């Protein structure tokens, strides 16, 4: 059995601590102050797995796409982000990305209802001509762990530095048919973590939430047990955030709801406190911006 001496561990920890004190970030920022703070201060750390979960229409895919756009803006030439979409076409995802990045209504892009300035700003801007080149967008209805591992190894072989991997949605991943679905998902997450540690990238996954939340008496706030195939998922990840929009869910203490509000409720934080994060969403442009409050719960 291999072990690491306490002195070595202390040396590593103080090296990281000195970087944090000096303001050197070890993680990859989400673009949202409150989310980064909840994740430990530096954003998404390599080797860690974060889940954004919610019922259909709540915005789990939307928050993952907004984080993706924010991170694309920060990439160096050799760095890439991987986004695997299992439910939407790559065309739909790209349209949503363009709407977020350029703050243009999604229906204008979908219907071609753009003025000359809007069209030129997209075609000639640095986002489409440079930053978007760092996106590896994969459309697959049921990718397997082997598919993802092959993609990772091929990108590294090409000299790319992978900063993050996003899977939307976790439940659509193909798992070993000889075991239960939740066991298969847990095994897949375990193997992805190994690759994430080896190649130093973070993992973001979106997850479905059981319909039983809709029929629950009282506040309809999901719990870890409401994650689909949840028996082992919650044990295998580091952070779980449930995405809620008060106009759909009853939130305790809120008599009036604002239609552009979005809440991230942290139900698992392996390394810190649970938080409630308020964000603001514009569904026309698909853009999510920082809210006003950050509350420890």
PLM regions with names:
Residues 86-88, 201, 206-208:
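Conserved H-loop
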Residues 2-12, 111, 128, 145-165, ...:
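C-terminal regions of RecA-like/P-loop NTPase motor modules
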Residues 163-202:
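Helical hairpin unit composed of two closely spaced alpha helices linked by a short loop
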Residues 2-104, 125-127:
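The Walker A/P-loop phosphate-binding site
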Residues 51, 137, 163-168, 241:
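Structural motif
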Residues 36, 74-161, 277-278:
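Cytosolic-facing regulatory segments adjacent to core modules
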Residues 107-114, 136-140, 174-186, 215-225:
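Flexible beta-alpha connector loops of hexameric P-loop NTPases
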């Amino acid at each position: 059995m291999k072990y690491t001496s306490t002195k070595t561990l202390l040396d590593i920890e103080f090296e990281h601590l000195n970087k944090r004190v000096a303001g050197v970030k070890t993680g990859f920022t989400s673009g949202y102050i409150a989310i980064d703070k909840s994740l430990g201060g530096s954003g998404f750390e390599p080797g860690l797995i974060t889940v954004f979960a919610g019922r259909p229409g709540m915005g789990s895919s939307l928050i993952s796409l907004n984080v993706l756009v924010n991170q694309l803006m920060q990439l160096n030439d050799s760095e890439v982000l991987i986004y695997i979409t299992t439910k939407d076409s790559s065309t739909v995802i790209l349209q949503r990305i363009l709407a977020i990045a350029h703050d243009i209504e999604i229906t204008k892009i979908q219907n071609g209802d753009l003025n000359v300035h809007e069209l030129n700003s997209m075609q000639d801007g640095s986002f489409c001509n440079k930053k978007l080149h760092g996106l590896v967008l994969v459309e697959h209805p049921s990718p397997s762990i082997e598919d993802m591992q092959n993609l990772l190894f091929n990108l590294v072989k090409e000299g790319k530095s992978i900063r993050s991997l996003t899977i939307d949605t976790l439940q659509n991943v193909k798992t070993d048919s000889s075991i239960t679905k939740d066991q298969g998902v847990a095994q897949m997450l375990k193997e992805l973590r190994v690759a994430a540690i080896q190649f130093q990238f973070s993992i973001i996954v979106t997850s479905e939430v059981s319909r039983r939340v809709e029929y629950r008496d009282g506040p309809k706030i999901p719990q870890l047990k409401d994650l689909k195939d949840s028996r082992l998922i919650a044990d295998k990840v580091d952070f779980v955030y449930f995405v809620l929009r008060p106009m759909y869910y009853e939130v305790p203490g809120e008599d009036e709801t604002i239609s552009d509000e979005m809440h991230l409720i942290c139900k698992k934080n392996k390394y810190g406190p649970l938080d409630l994060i308020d964000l603001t969403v514009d569904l026309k442009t698909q853009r999510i911006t920082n809210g006003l409050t950050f509350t420890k719960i």
